[in-house]
Amino acid sequence: MATNGVYIVMGEANCVVALLNKARRQYQLSQVPTLEDTDPLLRNFTDLKEVLNEVADLADMNPQTYLSPFLDVIKAQNTNGPITEAALAAVAKFLNYGLIDASSIKAANAVESIAYAVVHTKFIGGKSTGSDECVLFKILQVLRSLLLSPPGILLSNEAVCDMMQSCFRIVFEQNLSLLLRKAAESTLADMTQLIFTRLPTFVEDTRHPYIRQLVNPTEKRQKRKKKRQLSVHIETKAKEPENVPTEMTKLIGEAAETAETDGAANLGYDVVLTTDPPVDTVTHPDPPIEEIIKLAEPISAGDEADSESEGGGGEEHHERPPVRAHAGLQREIVSDEEEIDTEQTVGGEEKMPYGLPCCRELLRFLITMTNPVDRHNTESMVILGLNLLIVALEAIADFLPNYDILMPLIKNELCRNLLQLLDTNRLPVLAATNRCCFLLFESMRMHMKFQLESYLKKLQSIVLTEEKQHENGGGGTEQKEMALESLVQLWRIPGLVTEMYLNFDCDLYCGNIFEDLTKLLVENSFPTVGGHTASLLSLDALLVVIETIEQNCEDRENGRGEVAKEQEHKDLKKLGLPVLSGYDLAKKMAISTGGKASPMPVSSSIVLRSNRHAPSTELPSMSQIIEQKKRKRLIAEGTELFNQSPKKGIAFLREKGILGHDEQSLVQWLRTNPQLDKKAIADYICNRKHAEVLNAFVKSFPFENTRLDVALRMFLETFRLPGESAEIALVMQHFSEEWFRANNEPFFHVDAAFTLSYAIIMLNVDQHNPQAKRSQPPMTVDCFRRNLSGTNDSRDFDPEMLADMYQAIKTEEIVMPAEQKGTVKEDYMWKVLLRRGETAEGSFYHAPTGWNDHDLFAVCWGPAVAALSYVFDKSEHEQILQKALTGYRKCAKIAAYYGMKEVFDNLCIHLCKFTTLTSMRDGGAGGGADEDVDLSAAALLSHSSSPEAVALAFGENHKAQLATRTLFYLVHENGNILREGWRNLFEALLQLFRARLLPAELTEVEDYVDEKGWVNIQRVHQKELPHTRNDSGLLSWFGLGGGASEADRRKPTQEQLSSMKLASQVISECRPSQIVADSKYLTSTSLAELLSSIAANSAQIVEQAEPQQKTASLSGEDEDALVFYLELIVAITLENKDRLPLVWPHVRRHLEWLLSPRFGRCPVLVERAVVGLLRVANRNLFRDNTVSDDVLHSLSMLLRLSPKALFIFSRQIAFGLYELIRANAANVHKKEHWAVLFALLEAAGAAVLPDDYVMMTTTEKQQQSLRVGGDQQQQRMAYSDVEGASGRGGGAHEERAYTSEGEERRRGGYDSNSDLESRVDSAGSLLGAQKQPADWIHLDHKDAAKATEEALTALGANVVSSKKNFRQFGSLVLRNGLGRHEPAAFLKVCECLAFLLRDAVHVTPDNFESSLQCLRTMVEASLDGGVYAAGPLSGDAQNRLRSNVTDEKAVKKHHHHHHGHKKKELCTDVTEDADESRNEEQQLIGNYQQMSLHLLDLCSQLHSQTPAIFAKWAQGASPAASDLATVAFIWTDIWRPLLQAIGRLSCDCRRGVRAAALTHLQRAFLPANMATLGAAEWQSCFGEVLFPLLTKLLEPFSQMDPIGMEDTRVRTLQIVAKTLLNHLSALSALDSFPDLWMLLLDYMEQYLRVDSCGNLNEAVPESLKNMLLVMDSTGIFAATPRLYDVTVERLNKFMPELIKDTIPNPPRPGQQQSEASEPKKEHASGLEPPPPSSNSTAATSTSDPSIATAQSSISTASSVVGPLVTCPEDAGISAPIPIQHPLTEVIVHSGPTSPIGSPPQTEPPASSPPQHQHSEHQQYEQYRQQQAAAAQQYQQYNQNYPQQQQQQQQQYAYSPEHAAYYQQQYAHQQQQYAEHYANQYQHYQQQQQQQQQHPVNPTSPSVHGQYSVANPLPLPAHPAYHPIVAPSVNSAFTHVYTPPQNNAPALAPSAPTTTSADSPYFTPIPYNPSQQEKP
């Protein structure tokens, strides 16, 4: 209250008095007494002033005191408008300033008097309507201020109703201005808002007469019999002053008249609407007041049902009374003339403040205003009623269900009116209706389940109806759009969609609301002409569901709950703010009265918009929901079947378990299923066979306390009464009996009930059947009574009862409403709806947010994705496209959350279509919206499938870019659940690969050969791009047209370049390589599906290509596609090495498929498959599991490749195996795996062919040998390492694996599509080097291959002819079936062997045999400097494969000259530069020689370390080692193969290799190295090692180096002789020793007869002499019978004089015992051999046929040596291999005599220093003399044979480069000679001094033999180095030291030589030209 309230009242009073005086002066004509004495209004103000002058505060006064003068003015009839307005303004000011204290006991009377006075305002109207409307506006202001002020809560219900009524009158008066009417509407809104906001503070007090009338059944029955009450007639007329021209009261009077006449129903004074309660409706006890005012949390249905009304006493149930109320706002009845005395009470009681009665009357009146059936309700009235209902619902809708007197109005009348209003075409009404429905169902859907269902069906029907009208050319689509907008708003209610699915779709007898609406939205989401907005709304509705589910999934992932924080409002009393609205005031009032304000959720961006309603306590489980859904589908099917045939329908349902076999379950189903046909029900239950069902059906009705006609009406509504009288009688009999029993037998007999029931049916027909009315008039009530007289067991029925029945039947016909139309049917259906709502079927469950999202998404994802796809396809608006893609992303996230794989696949497949990348294969950017993409701007790229065209089309298609970004985003985020979509994704990746848009991570793959370590798998397949315009006009024909050049026309424009750059940028941002990297995070199923998809895509490419190319190879594009897919599989496999068991089966199947013969014409693909297999194996062998074993075993797939393929891919295999073994040698543990690895090494490095090819080759050689004679063997054109190799590269280019097409076209070779067979040279096959040695021999013949083949054919003939005689001999051929190998692969395999065998670190019992076999094979392949090699190395191609793309400049430069050129990709090509070729050839010579020496070192090292290796294995307790550590095994499987390999290299054409091999062989045969061998092993050694070596050396293996050949033979003979003598005692004990000895004599004879330079002529006799002397001295001849005779007989044939010099006399028998011990003593005193070289490398070998030069003699000896060894039938003798330089050898003299020679030059052992026979100077002089003699002999040789030299030079065609090279080497040799001689001279001086200090007895017993040193030169530092002597500069001194050359790295020198019995010395034998035959 204002402190200056007295002055405020005084001021307002003065203002009103002034206006009254003014009015008095205007109308008073004569002077009268003072106005105060005559005017009561002025007198009241005078009294008020006196009172105010006496008080200090208004609080001390009664408010009625200072209000009454103003109120009198307001009610006065003779005051004008301004006076009344001033009085109203004063009252408003008093209220606004709070002058009336609400806590005062007099405040209630004060506000009541104000309300009455304002409602009954009277004034004299003015001339202008504006001034009158000002008074009316002030009335509205006072009414609003009064109700909204704090004292307003004291107003009575009647006062509030009158106030609202006054405002309604102003609103409905059309004569008033629009502004005033809108102000009245605003006032009504504020007042309505206040009243309903205060609803939580109201209580249902049954003591109130209004409440008692509604809830008391006794009053209900009494009121029915009373006269209907009339509403209060508010006084609108008064006596008019005669002098007032315009009556002030006419406005309100006219408004009242209008209300009474034109619109009585609007305010309803005389209209009474009675709403009967639904049948069988039982109300629950009212909730207590304490529960009502608890506003913090809503009252649940359970609480409401369990609570009891305060005024309900002990009653538990009350029948709901009829709501009998006036259409207008009711109040207490008073007379029109009586005025309310505010100081007195009505009826002796004080009026109660307004509450629920006022609230209900207002609600009822608003509902009445919205009734569309009432014609008096205009559109404006309906809109006003809807708006005020919206205000009420917005204010406090959540609390309306707490009041039982309000909910019936809402459930019945309000919902019925709203549903009827939805049929209107008036858009404002429709909009307001939808808004009201939204608020209603958002808050109270739990209590209106079926009303909500009806509303949703109504919206659906609106959309469908508008569609039909639009299709028929009807009006617009505004109603449809409003309906869709309403659906969107409903869908946005948190939890509503979930509840809809739960309560309707999962309800047995409700429609599938959610599914049907989803289909409807999908159908409307497709854009149509004029329906763009509707489609967007439909799409929004679909997306709302998707977004809600997605948000729920995200919140569950992040752990955010559903509890929304709530807080109460702060105490509004503390806020000194003015009242802005009734809502604020109501909140203040609620707090002031102790109530709590309604909860308001805190606005927070973090808290999820959860369901406002608490979840229901009895929520079904998910399993129950699933089962319910299944039952619903079965019931729907059974219902349809029942309507056709009831018997079949019931049988079906019973079969499915839906119905039991009892009648109760069947009857329950018949009663509760609203979809059943009423006639079908009657046909079933009226059948006499189903009497039990009929009986149970009748008993299911609640007939208790129900009048017979009402019960009969209820009964007949459930089925259609049959037409047969018998059936009717049957049904009526059962009905009457049940009703009679249920109502406690109200009649005297049951037949009375039957009769009365039948009479009611007849009465219904009589009253309503048109035919009956025409025949006779309808009966009256008296007739009806007479007809039933005496039927109640001879008594009459109650007349009043019969009258009521008659009246009910006459008024309302008993009909079958379901068969009716219009209002009858609608009323019945609505009544059924209300009845179902009151049963358990009407229970509505509130579900938590996201409770059943999975099922919802399963229902809507398909339609939603289809709609999104269509919208994205057809729309071009960026906003719509983004919305569609957002929907895709959210659907994908939901699918990933729930693991719905088919959903995610569908999304990805749709997006792949929109990327326009999946159909590029067909040559177009087709698919969806991009079919009309115009590429005409791309001048030459239009209609082209070139990479540039694809990139351009993609860069210009913004929609495709958006889809691509989304696609890759989804795959990166949720690839785990992708299944079928992988195929489409990889198809899109393939198109990007073809368009060259993929990043380097996917196109640059690992490679073993390329020096960079990677290659680019993208190749250029250029095609001529079509021109955009064909200049074929006349000017073009004359050359005047087409000014632009061809290059200008093909050049893309700047815009096109920008588009292609944009395309590349988009793909880069998509990060496609992340798919491979993230594959390790995929689930097992997804990963397996990914690999299967790639394999399926690969197979599809082949299937599509095969119909057109069944015989040809795949196109370049298809091959590249398969390569791309293969590299993806390999990369994914490497990323998932931890899950190799899962991945490997898929990878293996794919690799087996690619390595099959189907792809024999696709070398690029097969090569990458080989590399991929090796990469997988290399990365996964460290794992110790079965999969690693399987991976190793799978390498055997490479062995199944054809020999040609193995040759082509030998580099990759060799380099890959090298990396594999280096990294995983310790991880291979099984023998079979090592066998596979070494077999691959042999195949790659030595071209070891499969067995079938070997057999074929052998057969061909046998056939050739029969046709060609053996005399052509000398035509073999081999060369030694002193020759040049410049001519060997002739066929090099034809033998590379791949080349670019440009190179092929220039050379006229094969194209890129040629098969593997065409990748080898056309001169011959790869089956063996025997057929193609011409590539390594420079001939004068024009056809080198033909000449070489003839030479080899001649050699093969000799081999075959001699094979039959040497079947029992071993062979030095280490491996048969070798093909031509790749040099780079050979060298890499040698490195691999060196790694494995060096120091025997990786040698195990599992790989020992395989490694030896591989070592022997590489030795065979390394023979003669690479005679098996396919061609010289190609420069840097030795270490890398030229598979990378060449630079653009080179391409352009070459393209200028060769239009057919293409980039070099994945090709093995060599340069044609001559200088580079010569350098490569020289490098090849050095590399092959180096590898041969490495292989020798490996053989020697393994030979010497074998005992140590076995000892190490024995220490490791290896069972395999213990089984193998036997002498027989070591010899057979280790030593013998190694000695054969060393012996094989002893036949090499290169002098250095031969010398080193003989040195290693000599060391191997030292007694200490193989001391454990027995006689049988030594016999085998001769038969399988030494004798085959002697046989091989009989062939002219190095004709250009005759001296070298002779020296090799000499050293070999000496090794054989020495070996025989060292083990003579053991061998002599054998029975076969005579045969062995005779065979050795045969070899001596053959070597003596061979062409010789003189050395052999001296060496053979000396060796024979030594052996004879030793054998004679040891008594061998004496011990062996006839051995001496045979020896003498044999020697007499070729050296008879030797017998005389050595053993002229036969041995004596007694001599054997005395002399047999000397050789043993010699053996015992043998010295240890020098340590072997520490260097070890690896190499390979091949096989050659044997030459039978001395066939006759060897044949004779073969029978003697036959028992020594056995050899396979197909084992041949190797072909002749030329050697270069002769080597000297020590001659061992065991007898008493020795040849004359020089003393040793090296330091003797300390135990027995050598004795010098000559002085140092004499030694040096003798050496010089020998040198001069040798030089003289060489000059003589040149003089005697100039013609021979000329022929040799012409034959071998030495180039000038070779001649210069040889001269340079000779000069270097001479320099080395001089340096060596000077050092030797100093050495001799030191030896002389030592001899003088320590003299030695020359006859010392420690010296068992004499040594003759013919050559003063010592051993070279390493046997690998030798001089290369030109033919024109031959020298007799053939073996000198040569330092390492540039092409061969220096090796560690061997250990210094020492003089011993086994030390080698050189014997320089002068060259004797006379002994050399001419060639």
Curated annotation (Swiss-Prot):
Record Gene3D superfamilies: 1.10.220.20, Arf Nucleotide-binding Site Opener,domain 2
Organism domain of life: Eukaryota
Transport found in the keyword field: yes
Keywords: ER-Golgi transport, Golgi apparatus, Transport
Chief site of localization: Golgi
Any GO MF annotation of the entry: guanyl-nucleotide exchange factor activity
SMART domains xrefs: Sec7 (SM00222)
Pfam families (UniProt xref): Sec7, Sec7-like_HUS, TPR_28
Gene Ontology CC, one term: endoplasmic reticulum-Golgi intermediate compartment
Domain SEC7: residue ranges: 624-812
Intracellular or extracellular location(s): Golgi apparatus, cis-Golgi network; Endoplasmic reticulum-Golgi intermediate compartment
Start-end of Basic and acidic residues biased regions: 1291-1309
Biological processes, Gene Ontology terms: endoplasmic reticulum organization; endosomal transport; mitochondrion organization; regulation of ARF protein signal transduction; secretion
Biased composition range(s): Polar residues: 1264-1277, 1895-1909
Protein name: Golgi-specific brefeldin A-resistance guanine nucleotide exchange factor 1 homolog
